[in-house]
Amino acid sequence: MEKTTFRNLLEKRVLLLDGAMGTEIQKFGLSEADFQGNLNINNGHELKGNNDLLVLTRPDVIESIHRSYLAAGADIITTCTFNAQAISQADYGTENLVKRINFEGAKLARKVADEFPQPRFVAGTMGPTTRLLSISDDAEHPEKRAITYDQLLEAYKEQALQLIEGGVDILLVETCLDPINAKAAIAAANNAIELSGRAEVSIMVSATVTDSNARLLSGQNIEAFAEAVASCSKYVDIIGLNCSMGVEAMLPPLRRLAEYTSKYVSVHPNAGLPNQMGQYDASPEKMAT
């Protein structure tokens, strides 16, 4: 029997992505010791909050989260690698662990996905990093940038290669705030796919809009973003939205995107902003409907 690939199934029906990783990790009440594990890191940085390290130090936690999402019916689970590139990991002094984190994170998700009888898929998460190319972080010198395009490209390439080696079906470039960062990530993903010979790997690109006019933090609207990223690689199969301003506020930008692009469209919103009591009005039931 022919193996069901991600692209095959994408043509047939709507696929369900898993939910948040960070908030699920919070439920375990982990300590600094959980993030340190047996890594013997004594660089003066607190590691608690560097969730990507948990694929090395507490794989049981990440495995449990993956399994719970699959048991709930998810078709796709996302790796715990959102900040697992050298640029973000340098803030913790753990950039030397990037290859291990991505490979082990992908391998762990792959193992859990393969436990289930029907085809389940693994998306290797590649976040926006902690540096942006379109916006300066120096108000006194707005022309300055904290990172170069080539540095981003190299960091993303290192990440993408290990995610593919670990067995992902999709490279998910998500929470895109800056189109230039996104282009670097897609170019790196494209390069990694071709170097690995894994042409069946899809690229999924997901932007985060910051206002009702469907603009990214950089000021670009969603149509311009979709046009820019669609042409970056022949492996880009999906363009979508994530996080942003909650379910209801995401619907108008989503409709605009769906009307504009010929690619498949994805959406995975957050719960929006808290109300005056510090609570979220969006319930799981409301999000599901």
Spans of model-derived segments:
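Domain-level signal for soluble alpha/beta catalytic cores
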Residues: 1-289
